Amino acid sequence: KMRTNKIIYIFIISLIMVACEPVDTQTDSNYDPELKLKELGIELTTPSSPVANYVNSVRSGNLLFISGKGPLKNDGNYIKGKVGSDLTIEQGYEAARITAVNLISTIKASVGDLKKVKRVLKVTGMVNAAPNFTDHPKVVNGCSDLIVEVFGDKGKHTRAAVGMGSLPSNIAVEIDMILEVMD
């Protein structure tokens, strides 16, 4: 009877251990961020070079940190100005969406295949805002909406959307992100 109880105990512990194993959410055969970009008509670009003593991305273990990027358009110009005085919320939203494309381009350059993105963890959106402007989240939604469109549930992230008195070169937004990636 004692041996039977030990076997049952070991069996129950084994079941608990199996139940607590992390589930690999990457097995979804429909997960293809690059195909989604193509469907949306979005072409990735070569990431802009850092303008100071930093790098575009750093990987530590399975974490990928992407440096702040701005709304650099395909014509080589940035969307500039303060949201709430020079730019509307809609223009700020578009600036954040373009910035998301630049962030995704940097992810691709860093890991090679966007299917390696296991989860977008954190997005920090800084809005170059007029002093009385308070709709920062509506602007940063331009980035968040595209990230979720491209990466699906894996793109749902934590976020900060904050207003700044100024940003480098008067760009409309600067956004950085942290992701979990696979080998």
Where are these regions (language model features)?
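Short, polar/acidic, helix-capping and beta-turn segments at strand->helix junctions
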Residues: 21-183
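Bacterial N-terminal signal peptides
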Residues: 9-18
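Bacterial N-terminal signal peptides that target proteins for export
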Residues: 2-8
